Amino acid sequence: MDAEAIEIWTDVNGIMTADPRVCPDALRVKTISFEEAAELAYFGAKVLHPATILPAVQKNIPVLVLNSRNPENEGTRITALATHCRSPFKSIAAKKRLTIVDLVASRMLLSHGYLHAVFEVFDNHKCAVDMVSTSEVSISLTVDSNDHLPELAAELSKLADVTYEGRKALICLVGGNIRGQNGIAAQVFHAVRHINVRMISQGASEINMSFMIDEDDVDEAVRSLHAAFFVDPDPDIFDVTARKAIESVHL
């Protein structure tokens, strides 16, 4: 595939800082990197699918996310390298219908090959794992909720004591500017201090920060985070014209 650009036509003005149905003041992201877009696609951004941008990443072809209902809008441009942004995050995504699986095995966790045996069970059931947290005697994992969890748990019970709890959701904040910045995690969890957080993760890429909460708390968490991190958006990265128009009406 050789092309100058790939156009993806959707029903929104490109990638947004959050789901506009949850945050009416969500902003259009003007430009974002392939790496950042791939993270958002995996963690639930509705306008992208991971397989959609993979060929473009491999060929270094820019991707344009445009609105078929508003073709004059510039949309979002996805490029190989991220443009510098003074804001730590570009967007907030949420992935619902997840289940936390907890395994406790005080004797076996330290034995050689234990984690391999656990993940082999998930592989046998073709069950992808989103997040993993381990301690001396336990493992917590998150998976998509499905009807086969009882069978999965039954097989895992041969390795450990197993419990699982559904109706969870993953909140993911994505931005290349969080690398090496002090205090970002403190700001994130201060913004959601009124919400119970079950698991926390920062990816090896260091461009995303994720945590698990109850599904019922998703909208409140996204709105709180958006209010905390997009109060003074970088106009080079975000389309602030709509927000300025609303503010001028209220003056």
Model regions and ranges:
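C-terminal catalytic "cap/lid" subdomain
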Residues: 1-251
